[in-house]
Amino acid sequence: VLDGNAILFITERYGMRAHASWGSLNDVMLVFMNQDAYDKFRLSKEDYELQKELEKEQKNTTEAKKNDKKKGDNKEKSEEKKEEKVKDIVVELNNIEDRIVRLTPNSSDLGSAIITKDGETLYYLSAFEGGYDLWKMNLRKKDTKLLHKMDAGWANMEMDKDGKNLFLLGSNTMQKMGTDSESLKPISYQAHVKMDLAAERDYMFNHVYKQEQKRFYNLNMHGIDWDAMTKAYRKFLPHIDNNYDFAELLSEYLGELNVSHTGGRFRPQLKGDATATLGLLYDWNHNGKGLLISEVVEKGPFDHARSKVKAGNIIEKIDGQEITPESDYSVLLNGKARKKTLVTLYNPQTKERWEEVVVPVSNGVMSDLLYARWVKQRAADVDKWSNGRLGYVHIESMGDDSFRSVYSDILGKYNNREGIVIDTRFNGGGRLHEDIEILFSGKKYFTQVVRGREACDMPSRRWNKPSIMVQCEANYSNAHGTPWVYSHQKIGKLVGMPVPGTMTSVSWETLQDPTLVFGIPVIGYRLPDGSYLENSQLEPDIKVANSPETVVKGEDTQLKAAVDELLKEIDGKSVSYTHLRAHETDQYL
């Protein structure tokens, strides 16, 4: 930007960072290549205007001298075309770090940023409330204003070469804005394309081949002759005429690499029927009419003060339609998510019948409610088995939301517990191994005391007491790496079942046909001995399986084993410490 005298970039230097390893608020910055450009940028509005007048006068004087000289030249010389000399960019690396300027007045979730050719105006896309909006900042006056409320889920923009128009691409629209009028106008278009789908699939197959060849984390492709393997699978292409089969072909093809985080996926853009749920659990041994309620799920549609629904009640009708043993009640909830629905109920104990209007939820919402129920049950079991001595946290995924929940619980309601059971089972990954390592590897070095009263132990933002981690066969990706780091750093023991070696980082790429996606494992995690965590199974210190027979009874054998082991460790350390203190006392008697 600024004719090559500065570089515009976005950084998280001043922004708030997420608890977890990624995610932050950003700022737009400029770094100036030379002192002259930096000095001009910092001029006040008045000084800048004076500077422009001075430069204008100097330019006029120079041109006048040139014109006087031309009068004496002959006609032939006056008609010669003079090549315009490209102005050199002066780059002064000395003290360049002192010529970095923060442009945005505050950090935010940024989408894109552009500075005008004269360096006077900054346009940027930022999300403060909801989606991305277009903001404008006068860099000389330091004046910022919201230019257009767009509320876009994602957005990007480019300026034309003359600097007269901004082109904005949002979630579902393309728009144009003249920098003089600053009014947004939609860009409408209509196009027809005739696709050779077989040729497109051939192109996409070649693209997958090249991308894996150039970006796969392991240089020898896990020992696979990639060209030969590609040739072997290419012969199936002429026989494929749909994306279902093409995605399956990609999965088989990429599966030859014997690696996680890859394969082809087809995401058909179809809107099918969606069955809602009432947020209830039922007794399937009930043979009569209606649905016998066995549990009202917490925070579900019926879990509110005005509802009389409880376990033991029977749902007789939904929107006036009777439920019989022969009928499928789910049909009555088709398309009812977030819509008011009339439910007729019966209490066998009091013989009372009544109706309630409820708003059913989607299966996705119900899944979240059942997850919260599962975690609450595990926490209650740990509390019961340890007699209130241990706390329990479950890391749902290796991301910021889960980390915040864990952080809040261990340093909040469980702060005074003697130990923590960390459950990673069924975690699909993300990136938290460093954060979990730091959080649970605290070692107390002193205590803050205020007028004789202990305030807190230090470090105060880490767990300084014993812990244990539970894992299972369903752990994946960073949920393999996190227990590995936890064990390798000797923070605590692992309890449960072996975890498949799936610790790589992936780049999921959408193909030219946006219904198709494939994965490239681009980062491997290598150990000092040269081996990788990928394909290296992680064994627990204490191997315990949850059998189907115990799971259906609501019993968690793995969790019970973890509680017993952690209590044994804590009690063992307590006995050892008491013995050590007694021995030290004997020395001074």
Predicted regions and their residues:
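A flexible loop/linker signature enriched in serine peptidases of the S9 family
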Residues: V1-E80, S126-D133, S171-Q175, K194-L197
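Multi-bladed beta-propeller domains
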Residues: F32-Q58, V90-S108, L139-G153, E182-L197
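Cleft-lining beta-strand/loop regions that shape enzyme active-site pockets
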Residues: R215, E316, Q321-E322, E326-D513, ...
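Interdomain regulatory linker/hinge segments that flank or connect interaction modules
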Residues: K231-L278, K336, L345-K351, V359-L370
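PDZ/PDZ-like domain segments forming the peptide/carboxylate-binding groove
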Residues: D273-P325, D400, I523
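Conserved small/polar residues in nucleotide/adenosyl-binding loops
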Residues: T578-T585
